[in-house]
Design a protein with these regions (language model features):
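PLP-dependent aminotransferase class I/II
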Residues: 4, 24-28, 33-38, 46, ...
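Short beta->alpha connector loops at strand-helix junctions that form conserved
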Residues: 1-7
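Active-site phosphate-binding strand-loop segment of PLP-dependent enzymes
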Residues: 8-86, 91-101
Length: 279
């Protein structure tokens, strides 16, 4: 099921969502912005909700609960460029016992010996002709992380809340200084956990000018994640299945630069001064 995106949250455009019953909703809190799960749950009360928090560690719902705790499960990425890192890898959170047990064996080739003891015993009893040390209950992957990666992550976890506050302060400055005549402004939700500064040009032809300014400043820039996914080869056959004008605005007019606890106000002033001077 395809729909358009909202230009303030980069999440679902509620007006383009289908009316039929949906079984599963995988919702992404993109670039640290807050996606409207509460609205979606009202629209699809029987759906299972899975959350993607890969770029949004610590983003909060209006009631103060952290995102990633309101659905069946949530994915977090600890890739090098995210809020905290274990160099590579990530984690899955869930309060569902069945999903928890499944994910444990999925990350380790599907082997039964990773189950909790009582379930492992049951699997052995149900499969007496198979060596219990190499009993595969499902297809799986080799996604086990290492102790070294865990040490790095645990140390960064101690500073995560402080770093998120610095990111929020930076994002607040960004939203209050970006020119609304030139750019679409993302929603400055107080619960955000900003990952980046997204510049979405109202005139798509201005994007190359903006990129050249960043290049002159030596600032790495990227598209707004994937832009319009329906233009990518693996989904292109469905590109005409739905009208997505907002996704196209992100695709053709959008670019982002990174936000982090290491970004200072002086750095941001330099960026905005360059845009004003060279536009």
């Amino acid at each position: 099921v395809f729909c358009d995106v909202d230009l303030e949250t980069y999440s679902f455009d509620m007006d383009t969502l289908p009316e039929e019953d949906i079984r599963i909703v995988f919702i992404t809190h993109l670039l640290g912005l807050n996606s409207p799960i509460e609205q979606l749950k009202k629209k699809y009360p029987n759906a299972i909700f899975l959350e993607d928090i890969c770029e949004s560690h610590g983003v909060k719902a209006p009631n103060g609960m952290k995102r990633g705790s309101t659905g069946l499960g949530a994915t977090f990425s600890f890739y090098y460029g995210h809020h905290m890192t274990t160099i590579e890898g990530g984690m899955i959170c869930t309060d569902n016992e069945d999903l928890y047990e499944l994910m444990k064996i999925k990350r380790s080739h599907g082997m039964a010996r990773l189950l909790s003891p009582h379930l492992y015993k049951e699997a052995i009893e149900n499969n007496p002709d198979i060596d219990p040390a190499f009993l595969f209950l499902t297809d799986g992957y080799n996604f086990r992380n290492t102790e070294l990666n865990a040490v790095i992550g645990l140390e960064q976890l101690k500073r995560l809340d402080e770093n998120i506050k610095l990111r929020r302060d930076n994002f607040d400055y960004f939203v209050n200084n970006v020119d609304p005549n030139l750019f679409y402004i993302p929603y400055n939700d107080p619960g955000n956990s900003s990952f980046a500064f997204p510049f979405v040009c109202k005139n798509p032809e201005d994007r190359e000018k903006l990129k050249s300014i960043f290049d002159e400043l030596g600032i790495e820039h990227r598209p707004i994640v994937s832009g319009n996914l329906l233009l990518h080869p693996f989904l292109k056959k469905w590109k005409d299945s739905v009208s997505v004008p907002n996704a196209n605005k992100l695709n053709y007019g959008g670019v982002y630069i990174g936000n982090s606890q290491f970004i200072t106000k002086d750095m941001m002033v330099k960026v905005f001064d360059a845009i004003k001077t060279k536009w």
